[in-house]
Curated annotation (Swiss-Prot):
One of its GO terms (cellular component) is cytoplasm. One of its GO terms (biological process) is protein ubiquitination. Kelch repeats lie at residues 308-353, 354-400, 402-447, 449-496, 497-543, 545-591. Coiled coil: none annotated. It is found in: Cytoplasm, Cytoskeleton; Cell projection, Ruffle; Cell projection; Cell projection, Lamellipodium. Keywords: Actin-binding, Cell projection, Cytoplasm, Cytoskeleton, Kelch repeat, Repeat, Ubl conjugation pathway. The lineage of its organism: Eukaryota, Metazoa, Chordata, Craniata, Vertebrata. Substrate-specific adapter of a BCR (BTB-CUL3-RBX1) E3 ubiquitin ligase complex that mediates the ubiquitination of target proteins, such as NPTXR, WNK1, WNK3 and WNK4, leading most often to their proteasomal degradation. The BCR(KLHL2) complex catalyzes ubiquitination and degradation of NPTXR. Responsible for degradative ubiquitination of the WNK kinases WNK1, WNK3 and WNK4. Plays a role in the reorganization of the actin cytoskeleton. Promotes growth of cell projections in oligodendrocyte precursors. It comes from Rattus norvegicus (Rat). PANTHER family: KELCH PROTEIN, KELCH-LIKE PROTEIN 2. Signal peptide: none annotated. This is Kelch-like protein 2. Its main location: cytoplasm. InterPro entries: BACK, BTB-kelch_protein, BTB/POZ_dom, Kelch-typ_b-propeller, Kelch_1, KLHL2_BTB/POZ, SKP1/BTB/POZ_sf.
Amino acid sequence: MESPPLPPACTKQGHQKPLDSKDENPEKHCPLTVNPWHMKKAFKVMNELRSQNLLCDVTIVAEDMEIPAHRVVLAACSPYFHAMFTGEMSESRAKRVRIKEVDGWTLRMLIDYVYTAEIQVTEENVQVLLPAAGLLQLQDVKKTCCEFLESQLHPVNCLGIRAFADMHACTDLLNKANTYAEQHFADVVLSEEFLNLGIEQVCSLISSDKLTISSEEKVFEAVIAWVNHDKDVRQEFMARLMEHVRLPLLPREYLVQRVEEEALVKNSSACKDYLIEAMKYHLLPTEQRMLMKSVRTRLRTPMNLPKLMVVVGGQAPKAIRSVECYDFKEERWHQVAELPSRRCRAGMVYMAGLVFAVGGFNGSLRVRTVDSYDPVKDQWTSVANMRDRRSTLGAAVLNGLLYAVGGFDGSTGLSSVEAYNIKSNEWFHVAPMNTRRSSVGVGVVGGLLYAVGGYDGASRQCLSTVECYNATANEWTYIAEMSTRRSGAGVGVLNNLLYAVGGHDGPLVRKSVEVYDPTTNAWRQVADMNMCRRNAGVCAVNGLLYVVGGDDGSCNLASVEYYNPTTDKWTVVSSCMSTGRSYAGVTVIDKPL
């Protein structure tokens, strides 16, 4: 029986035409079939052949590792091997090729990748994998390594990643690590990596217009810390470093009380000249300051890093573990990892890229435990305990140390103060306050730590007194009193001014707000909040002062409102927390990338 005839060649009209027709090309009109699995299957078979040492025509050697392979596969996937095997080098004919620049295990991983397109990048192997991928010109692997390192950026390692990226010509990673260091400057300068930088690298960093800092104090203190880390060698660089510190942008009080008293400044005539320049700037009328143009009078213009407000624990109505974050850009709340244990009435700070929950009350006991939260890992970790049990304490960061101020230990109000060194993971006592203060609010302005109001437990009265701590002198000094007694007031700092928000005097819960100006040592009233609040959290972000939760004397509040100093007006945020809570810890953090 004859086979059926082949179908005719395709034509537009469906008629038969000879295949050699000059006016029609059948390839134009017949569909092209592409099998996406063909290459994958082919490489799978080639890898199986390699594993059985079949048809292999070269052995790649590194250290004591011997890896059989196929020249054509290596040449097809790696420009390095392509040049080696198709050129006139002796390796093009050799049965064994030794690679001296790469260790055996790393080379095996990369040749495995050539055959399988699979590779696992980890913290342990990325520093050897990336340069090896660069040598073999496996750009996809190098890119994967860079993306992994970018995901690991943190204040404690970004400078090291920046140097690594520079060494291996990873331009995109270099730029991202540099931007990260600028955006997290206040935390980066607390790291060992910063203290171990060379002078050129420090100057490059502190001269950037893009530094994200709350005040130029951060730059000055970073310079002093870097020099003191190896004082005998580095003090000769003081003048060169101070050229990049914008002293005219610092408050006059800070210049007099901190900069002028710094021994490293006193011992340098050039540094004194920069200080004189700054003092002259402050003495000039505003309109004349515009004429005094220099790099040190120019405002830094950082990129706006997205922020999150973190609300930790609190009473609702008992101590809770819940942690909520508010995204200012998206205007919504979301839950993150819970506290390891119930905690309310704790101190709260953001330091070195971590949130610290300090002391507090767990529902039955006042505690001295401290937990830290890593926003990148969404994970809580315990650190060293305080020396004393404290609840309703104040917590703040001054000169790279975390201070726990006053509070209540379960039997009496406390005047004691202790500080935490994150590098040594140790707490130590400093000078006590002049007054016992529980339910105290604290804030840092101009290099001084302020303790505002509270309850002394002895007179059984709420306090209107305020005192400030000078870390250099290790002493507390009374300053001007508030206009009214406030215990459980929220305290925040905005534009170098100290705000005392709400609080109570006995059963009277307040919605009034007053603000302290260190330059005049005086308090003044500003607009009242929309509702009475005590034991609320306070934080400043984007030029606004936020007040979170608290209670009004009868119930816990889930609402949030913010104060705009330009309009002297309070506005209630449309989105509330998932639950009303008072005595919660509140702070603002950089949104994880």
